[in-house]
Amino acid sequence: MKNLLLITFFVVSTVTALGGRGSKSALVLVAARSSENHPLHATDPITIWCAPDNPQVVIKTAHFIRSSDNEKLEAALNPTKKNATYTFGSPSVKDAGEYKCELDTPHGKISHKVFIYSRPVVHSHEHFTEHEGHEFHLESTGTTVEKGESVTLTCPVTGYPKPVVKWTKDSAPLALSQSVSMEGSTVIVTNANYTDAGTYSCEAVNEYTVNGKTSKMLLVVDKMVDVRSEFQWVYPLAVILITIFLLVVIIVFCEWRNKKSTSKA
């Protein structure tokens, strides 16, 4: 009877303490440009896994659920049925994020979170070029506005964990004012003045730990803003009018000389 009670106590303790363990992986990325239609892919496959924290517990069925879109991924079990895995042959930045591993065991269900991390990358249809050959320092095409107009500067970055974004202007921290404000990670310049022209840089940073090593990842995106005079169109027009005037003067002068020469003859 005593032995039976001990066995019962052991089984109950095992079931109550049932938990899981799982993987933490990171995408290996060698570029920083991605878009919805052409997501950036990692250079290596990634296998996520999870298992009961009690090595004696076997798994009956298992699957992973991606938290971002609730997509269900059927897991494969190893021969001993003590580990569940799913392999992404060519993972993209859209696969980064949190996954819930759900295991069904003879002792009950286990739920555990696993993670795929991604450094910050640009995720946009905008055109970007590498700054001086640095793949994680990008430049966008410049924006030109007239004095008094408004301009909106976005920082279209993605990554997991979600990157922390800060802005600088001409390598100094961005100073907010009545004309320069922020909504989330977007900079809005209203009633632009000549002093608002310059290089606005979005700096996106995230940090994660894989296999005991903590990585802090940085992406810099430069956006140039040029503010021109609202009367700038007058200058080319003035040049054209002056040119026409000079041509008319030359033609009239030539005609006058021709007439004068003819009258002398």
Swiss-Prot record:
Membrane topology: Single-pass type I membrane protein
All ranges on the Cytoplasmic side of the membrane: 254-265
Pfam family name, one: Ig_3
Function: Probably not involved in maintaining the position of ASI and ASH head neuron cell bodies and ventral nerve cord axons of PVQ, PVP, RMEV, AVK and HSN neurons.
Subcellular localization: Cell membrane
InterPro entries to which the protein is assigned, alphabetical: Ig-like_dom (IPR007110), Ig-like_dom_sf (IPR036179), Ig-like_fold (IPR013783), Ig_sub (IPR003599), Ig_sub2 (IPR003598)
Name of the featured protein: Zwei Ig domain protein zig-1
Tissue distribution: Expressed in neurons and body wall muscles.
Cysteine disulfide links: 155-202
Listed GO MF terms: cell-cell adhesion mediator activity
GO cellular component: axon; plasma membrane
Residues listed as glycosylation sites in the UniProt record: 83, 193
Protein's organism: Caenorhabditis elegans
GO annotation, biological process: axon guidance; dendrite self-avoidance; homophilic cell adhesion via plasma membrane adhesion molecules
Annotated signal sequence range: 1-17
Classification via Gene3D superfamilies: Immunoglobulins
Annotated TM spans: 233-253
Effect of deleting the gene: No visible phenotype. No defect in the positioning of ASI and ASH neuron cell bodies. No defect in the positioning of PQV, PVP, RMEV, HSN and AVK axons in the ventral nerve cord. In a zig-2, zig-3, zig-4 or zig-5 or zig-8 mutant background, cell body positioning of ASI and ASH head neurons is normal.
Keywords: Cell membrane, Disulfide bond, Glycoprotein, Immunoglobulin domain, Membrane, Repeat, Signal, Transmembrane, Transmembrane helix
SUPFAM superfamilies tied to this protein: Immunoglobulin
Residue numbers on the Extracellular membrane side: 18-232
UniProt domain Ig-like C2-type: residue ranges: 41-108, 120-220
